[in-house]
């Protein structure tokens, strides 16, 4: 009993509380707020998430806000305990290669060894395991549209049917922006190579080993791996657990919050305590009724 009272007293103290909170943040879950519209369709600006820190191993613990590691990266893979790698199609939280203290959330489009094409039609994926096996494609991507490039079978928008939040604008503005950057000598601002293939211009990238090509579900309003490159495993933080709170922000187009200040900071009750899978079920129901 004396031991339990001592434990209770420690946990009730300021020092004990701080240590417990830090342990939770280091090893279990951390709260983040989504500021941008890059994942709109699935996750919205103003969504407040708990991120599961142990989805892909345990990242090196960092002091919140200043992002200072509390220990060296002995394995040089950014993780105290190495774990599973993000799978294709999963929503992942990570630190992008061009930042050190910012956290992004995107969908993992491709893994190491895969080949990616970004065209005026959308994204194409050539999974490295498939080779040229049509049976592999039909088994893993049933009913998907395919196209042959460089003698290889590529799958068009492979996750769109399963994840209904993924969408493009009709005119694919991002493709034209990237084409403009590439032709004006600003290739340093994009990570994909502009090439001529089968009579059309496409952007191509082969993903390096243990790296991941991260793309926003709002394909035409997303700063992602098309611009700053694929993400190494050492930068992977975790996966969204659930939305614990959600507010409309100034950039919330659905309620025209920029022009109507009264529409800012409205609570989105229907999004609270929903996982990504739960939010996708809502999207499917909404689409089914329209």
UniProtKB/Swiss-Prot annotation:
Q: Which domain of life is it from?
A: Bacteria
GO CC terms for this protein? Answer: plasma membrane
EC number in record: 3.4.21.89
* Key words of the record: Cell membrane, Hydrolase, Membrane, Protease, Transmembrane, Transmembrane helix
Family matches, as SUPFAM superfamilies: LexA/Signal peptidase
Give the transmembrane region(s): 14-34
Q: Which Pfam families match?
A: Peptidase_S26
Provide Extracellular-side residue ranges: 35-290
Q: Where are the active-site residues found? A: 38, 106
Name the PROSITE patterns on file: SPASE_I_3
Official protein name in the record: Signal peptidase I
Tell me the disulfide pairings in this chain: none
């Amino acid at each position: 009993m004396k031991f339990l009272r001592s434990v209770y007293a420690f946990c009730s103290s300021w020092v004990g509380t701080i240590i417990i909170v830090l342990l939770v943040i280091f090893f279990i879950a951390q709260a983040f707020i989504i500021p941008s519209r890059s994942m709109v369709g699935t996750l919205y600006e103003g969504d407040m998430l708990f991120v599961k820190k142990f989805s892909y191993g345990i990242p090196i613990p960092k002091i919140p806000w200043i992002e200072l590691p509390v220990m060296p990266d002995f394995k040089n893979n950014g993780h105290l305990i190495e774990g599973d790698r993000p799978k294709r199609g999963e929503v992942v939280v990570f630190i992008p290669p061009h930042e050190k203290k910012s956290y992004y959330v995107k969908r993992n489009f491709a893994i190491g060894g895969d080949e990616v094409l970004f065209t005026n039609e959308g994204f194409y994926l050539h999974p490295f395991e498939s080779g040229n096996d049509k049976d592999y494609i039909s088994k893993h991507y049933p009913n998907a549209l395919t196209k042959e490039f460089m003698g290889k079978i590529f799958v068009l928008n492979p996750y769109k049917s399963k994840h209904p939040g993924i969408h493009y604008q009709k005119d694919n503005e991002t493709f034209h922006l990237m084409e403009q950057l590439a032709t004006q000598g600003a290739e340093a601002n994009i990570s994909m190579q502009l090439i001529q293939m089968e009579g059309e211009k496409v952007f191509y990238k082969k993903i390096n080993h243990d790296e991941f090509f991260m793309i926003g579900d709002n394909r035409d309003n997303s700063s992602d791996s098309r611009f700053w490159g694929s993400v190494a495993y050492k930068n992977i933080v975790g996966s969204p657990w659930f939305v614990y709170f959600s507010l409309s922000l100034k950039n919330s187009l659905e309620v025209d919050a920029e022009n109507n200040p009264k529409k800012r900071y409205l609570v989105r009750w229907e999004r609270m305590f929903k996982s990504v899978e739960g939010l996708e079920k809502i999207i499917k129901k909404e689409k089914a009724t329209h």
